[in-house]
């Protein structure tokens, strides 16, 4: 008799995805982040669901309802800080996952990569709308500044912004719709994760060498289930340390003040995981130019497969490309730092140089170095 997990219509899908899935024997811990992201998404949906039971999306009571969750709901503070810091863990895992894809040439699985980029946009949109919900000062002004950027779109800009706001400023209508979309998007994201995995399992996983590994595969369970559980424990430990010892470390103190449309905070800035894009936005003096640079800084990931000139897939055996990759990482860290600084000398010029370098590395230097390495290897 066939094993039920191999014959049952539903269990068969689970079996082929997580149990008997043929996996390259050489994949390193950098391949753990997919499962960690899945767990992050599940955690966010779960904590978010319980928070939504106590939250009210009305400008008069939103701030008070968050206070009520933290003070009066049983373990409400744990839920709230797990959700807020869970978002930070989500983005740490996301950026490491994308970085892994760039380093090892995983972007050559174009369908998987493109769905992944759409997923990144979906998670960013969800996080932005979630930041608005507590209705603190930074929530209100962050929403005002970022949505107002759309007014730079020629001809339809102003109408578009007012349509998104549901009025002439960020107000009750804006908060209500942001809550609705913040609740909805994670479920859409979950469906897209299925598509992401569907495309991935069509080709199988890449591996650190970038060489096809069809001849050397092992079952996902028990080898990689155990390996992923180690990564999970490490992430949960880091998250709990953050939640229980420094829950506000990554937040903004201004958000503990209720939203006040008549008082602007001295430095309006988004959450830390958007600071690199915010720095690119601010480094261009023109409004439309800044908005375009902001969008392109993420959208550029879509064209990375087209910019691959090397005859090797992975960077494992390409030292010059490795140097460029780590320069890109350092540049992104610099942009993140600049995004949190005030708009004054020397931060402005550093931000502008880092922004130019960011686009130059991806569009110019990496393809050229790929060609150069081909030439050096006489290929």
Swiss-Prot record:
Protein name, per record: Cytochrome b
Mind telling me which GO cellular component terms the entry cites? mitochondrial inner membrane; respiratory chain complex III
Residues annotated as binding a ubiquinone: 201
Q: Which domain of life is it from?
A: Eukaryota
Compartments where found: Mitochondrion inner membrane
Q: Which residues bind heme b b566?
A: 97, 196
Which cofactor is recorded for it? heme b
From what organism does this protein derive? Cnephaeus serotinus (Serotine bat)
Molecular-function GO terms, alphabetical = metal ion binding; ubiquinol-cytochrome-c reductase activity
Where heme b b562 binds, per the record, is at: 83, 182
User: Does the entry feature the keyword Electron transport, yes or no?
Assistant: yes
Q: Which Pfam families match?
A: Cytochrom_B_C (PF00032), Cytochrome_B (PF00033)
Q: Which family does it belong to?
A: Belongs to the cytochrome b family.
The UniProt entry lists membrane topology as: Multi-pass membrane protein
- Cofactor remark: Binds 2 heme b groups non-covalently.
UniProt cross-references to InterPro entries, sorted A to Z: Cyt_b/b6_C, Cyt_b/b6_C_sf, Cyt_b/b6_N, Cytb/b6-like_sf, Cytochrome_b, Cytochrome_b_C_euk/bac, Cytochrome_b_N_euk/bac, Di-haem_cyt_TM
Print the keywords alphabetically: Electron transport, Heme, Iron, Membrane, Metal-binding, Mitochondrion, Mitochondrion inner membrane, Respiratory chain, Transmembrane, Transmembrane helix, Transport, Ubiquinone
Is-annotated flag, keyword NAD?
Answer: no
Q: Where is it mostly found?
A: mitochondrion
The remark listed among the other comments is: Heme 1 (or BL or b562) is low-potential and absorbs at about 562 nm, and heme 2 (or BH or b566) is high-potential and absorbs at about 566 nm.
Residue intervals passing through the bilayer: 33-53, 77-98, 113-133, 178-198, 226-246, 288-308, 320-340, 347-367
Q: What does this protein do?
A: Component of the ubiquinol-cytochrome c reductase complex (complex III or cytochrome b-c1 complex) that is part of the mitochondrial respiratory chain. The b-c1 complex mediates electron transfer from ubiquinol to cytochrome c. Contributes to the generation of a proton gradient across the mitochondrial membrane that is then used for ATP synthesis.
> Can you supply a Gene Ontology BP term from the record?
mitochondrial electron transport, ubiquinol to cytochrome c
Q: Which gene encodes it?
A: MT-CYB
Q: How does it assemble?
A: The cytochrome bc1 complex contains 11 subunits: 3 respiratory subunits (MT-CYB, CYC1 and UQCRFS1), 2 core proteins (UQCRC1 and UQCRC2) and 6 low-molecular weight proteins (UQCRH/QCR6, UQCRB/QCR7, UQCRQ/QCR8, UQCR10/QCR9, UQCR11/QCR10 and a cleavage product of UQCRFS1). This cytochrome bc1 complex then forms a dimer.
């Amino acid at each position: 008799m066939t094993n039920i997990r191999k014959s049952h219509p539903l269990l068969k899908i689970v079996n082929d995805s997580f149990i008997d899935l043929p996996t390259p024997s050489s994949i390193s811990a950098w391949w753990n982040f997919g499962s960690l992201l899945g767990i992050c998404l599940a955690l966010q949906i779960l904590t978010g669901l319980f928070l939504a039971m106590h939250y009210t999306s009305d400008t008069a009571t939103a701030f008070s309802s968050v206070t009520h969750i933290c003070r009066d709901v049983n373990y409400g503070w744990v839920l709230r800080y797990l959700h807020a810091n869970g978002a930070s863990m989500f983005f740490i895992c996301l950026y490491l996952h994308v970085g892994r894809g760039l380093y090892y040439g995983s972007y050559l699985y174009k369908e998987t990569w493109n769905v992944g980029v759409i997923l990144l946009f979906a998670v960013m949109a969800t996080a932005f709308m979630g930041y608005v919900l507590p209705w603190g000062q930074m929530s209100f002004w962050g929403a005002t500044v970022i949505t107002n950027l759309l007014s730079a779109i020629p001809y339809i800009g102003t109408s578009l912004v007012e349509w998104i706001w549901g009025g002439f400023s960020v107000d009750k209508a804006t908060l209500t719709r942001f809550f609705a979309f913040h609740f909805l998007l994670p479920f859409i994201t979950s469906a897209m994760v299925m598509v992401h995995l569907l495309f991935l399992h069509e080709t199988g996983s890449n591996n650190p060498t970038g060489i096809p590994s069809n001849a050397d595969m092992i079952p996902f369970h028990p080898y990689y289930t155990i390996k992923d559980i180690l990564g999970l424990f490490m992430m949960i430990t880091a998250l709990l340390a953050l939640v229980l010892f420094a829950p506000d470390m990554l937040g903004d103190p201004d958000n503990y003040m209720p939203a006040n449309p008549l008082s602007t905070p001295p430095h309006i800035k988004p959450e830390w995981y958007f600071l690199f894009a915010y720095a690119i936005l601010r480094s261009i003096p023109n409004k439309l130019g800044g908005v375009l640079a902001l969008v392109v800084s993420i959208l550029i990931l879509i064209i990375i497969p087209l910019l691959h000139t090397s005859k090797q897939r992975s960077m494992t055996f390409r030292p010059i490309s490795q140097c460029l990759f780590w320069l890109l990482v350092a540049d992104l860290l610099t942009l993140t730092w600049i995004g949190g600084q005030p708009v004054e000398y020397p931060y402005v010029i550093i931000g502008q140089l880092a922004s130019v370098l960011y686009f130059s590395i991806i569009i110019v230097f990496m393809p050229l170095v790929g060609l150069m390495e081909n030439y050096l290897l006489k290929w």
